[in-house]
């Protein structure tokens, strides 16, 4: 297969994994587009994206326009004369003129099995909804939000102990292989584009800190899914004794209870069992204010008086 001249557009670590795969391949990455440097850390020092750092280390030209809607930026991109543009978590909208500029257009790596979970948080929403599988879709981009024709899909079962952190890692390994496979198919003309079924489409909205507040009136299963979805950010939490307590790991208990939602049923080193709107949730790992995440056994050693049976966990803001 003849090497393709590729423009890569991406910003976070997830994107950098894909850029590394392209650098390691026989293709030519002729330019990298990434978000402008942003203030980060306590000192608010201007910080380059992981994609920029990788590109600079390999002497690949880097472009950081604040927008691609203006003609000078579009002309600059067109002058690169790329065969294709690969977009992974870039963060800027590509207008139609940009999508149509490369010979083979622009393709995107998306962390879900489209058309399910279009949008910003597909990994988290798959867990939140209790999906049994996820995957990666390589898509020919159009002007819609993740609405383009699908070129290739890979599938990944979601395990009971998966969190957004673990799924992110798994998809960051799966995505680059899928991307290289799709590029080969595009170059050889062997890929058949598949339209997305709009009836099956749904939208993966961004997560919010407010959404991570545990509502004990929900079912134990739904809360278990949310805790996994919101790990590592924004992290599920509840209010108790005037403190915000983060919850990192739970499981659905086989215990049954008619107690009011939020009531502690039992507390031992094996876990703190809490009544919910349907079923009982066992808290396994939590984080007290200013402390590191700890097992429930360690939490009870430090603050066992907060978690005695029949105590009602208060989830109202103090």
Swiss-Prot record:
Entry GO CC: cytosol
Keyword Ribosomal protein belongs to the record: no
UniProt-listed InterPro entries: Fmt, Formyl_trans_C, Formyl_trans_C_sf, Formyl_transf_N, Formyl_transf_N_sf, Formyl_transferase-like_C_sf, GART_AS, Met-tRNA-FMT_C
Keywords: Protein biosynthesis, Transferase
Stored Pfam families: Formyl_trans_C, Formyl_trans_N
Enzyme class, spelled out: transferase
GO function term, MF aspect, one: methionyl-tRNA formyltransferase activity
Positions that bind (6S)-5,6,7,8-tetrahydrofolate: 112-115
Physiological role: Attaches a formyl group to the free amino group of methionyl-tRNA(fMet). The formyl group appears to play a dual role in the initiator identity of N-formylmethionyl-tRNA by promoting its recognition by IF2 and preventing the misappropriation of this tRNA by the elongation apparatus.
Name by which UniProt lists this protein: Methionyl-tRNA formyltransferase
Source taxonomy: Bacteria, Pseudomonadati, Pseudomonadota, Gammaproteobacteria, Alteromonadales
